[in-house]
Amino acid sequence: MVSAYLLANFGGPRHSNDIEVFLTSLLTDRDVTGGFLPSFIHKRLFSFIAKKRALKVLPQYNCIGGFSPIYQDTELLAETLSSHLDAPVITFHRYLPDTHPHTIQQLKTLGDFPIVGVPLFPHFTYAVTGSIVRFIHNQLPLLNISWVSHFGNHPEFISCMMDHILKFLQSHDISTHDCCLLFSAHGLPMRHVNKGDPYNMQCEKSFRAISERLPNIETHLCYQSKFGPGKWLSPSTKDLCATLKTDKKHVLIVPFGFTSDHIETLYEIEKEYIAVLIDKGYQALRVPAIYQSSQWVESLATIIQSTPHVEKKSLIKS
């Protein structure tokens, strides 16, 4: 019997003072940025990049209220989910390092009782879910924990996404025959894909499963948030918005793989990509992340309880 669940998310700045700390924690993570540099050089280089980038994104955070809602949304989700699972739900915010000691202490108190880790990412990548698993394993190597590695093709996720999209269309009086949906997932460098990361295959499979159940709607899969040099998964959301040609009047961008809204949905999609589509003459809107769905908590509980749990060794890239 599971004694507790670990609900893991990206984390995000709770206020402006968190921005540089958050970015430093993110960019110095070698599962994310990789590289062949010695550890101390890698850390110094990406700490410098994080400091510069923090200045660039500060106005973007100010534009969405000065913080990311992902931290609070994850905390509230854990509270609600606990009653559905009838067990404690502990939160882990990967790139908010000041929250880690409390999480580690909570996990330590569970001793050898079984725990299930639940990264809130539908599609697995070593750069995100793998990083979460590695961190927890490094901190608590003897922890009795198994993981929900991905759920992007789970019937409950597909059903919840469809319900969420169709309710949004209905609430905005948009016909399924007159809209085009851009499913925007987070991008990934091709160097990860070429080394066997299954992320893009899972995204494509999940996208097809949803599209097949929406036969009257034009759909496209794209990838956003490219950072740094090198080739990434394509097409990019930015390029697709710029080149899109459709006879549909309404174009909606659906956060795909983002279960919570944050800077990449509230600013990148809302303020940048939607503006491009509007300039092209479309009536464009951003669909909120699935967190806003009334069905989400119940669906997630079902996913957690019905998905085979995976041991850590298969989730960490050597």
Curated annotation (Swiss-Prot):
Keywords assigned by UniProt, alphabetized: Cytoplasm, Heme biosynthesis, Iron, Lyase, Metal-binding, Porphyrin biosynthesis
Subcellular location: Cytoplasm
Matching InterPro entries: Ferrochelatase, Ferrochelatase_AS, Ferrochelatase_C, Ferrochelatase_N
Residues annotated to bind Fe cation: 186, 264
GO cellular component: cytoplasm
Pathway(s) this gene product operates in, as recorded in its UniProt entry: Porphyrin-containing compound metabolism; protoheme biosynthesis; protoheme from protoporphyrin-IX: step 1/1
Listed EC numbers: 4.98.1.1
Entry's Gene Ontology molecular function annotations: ferrochelatase activity; metal ion binding
Pfam entry (one): Ferrochelatase
Protein origin, superkingdom: Bacteria
GO biological process, one term: heme biosynthetic process
Catalysed reactions, as listed in the record: heme b + 2 H(+) = protoporphyrin IX + Fe(2+)
Transmembrane segments: none
Main location per the UniProt record: cytoplasm
Any coiled-coil regions, as ranges: none
Enzyme class label: lyase
Function per UniProt: Catalyzes the ferrous insertion into protoporphyrin IX.
HAMAP family documented for this protein: Ferrochelatase
Family, similarity comment: Belongs to the ferrochelatase family.
Record-given protein name: Ferrochelatase
Organism: Chlamydia caviae (strain ATCC VR-813 / DSM 19441 / 03DC25 / GPIC)
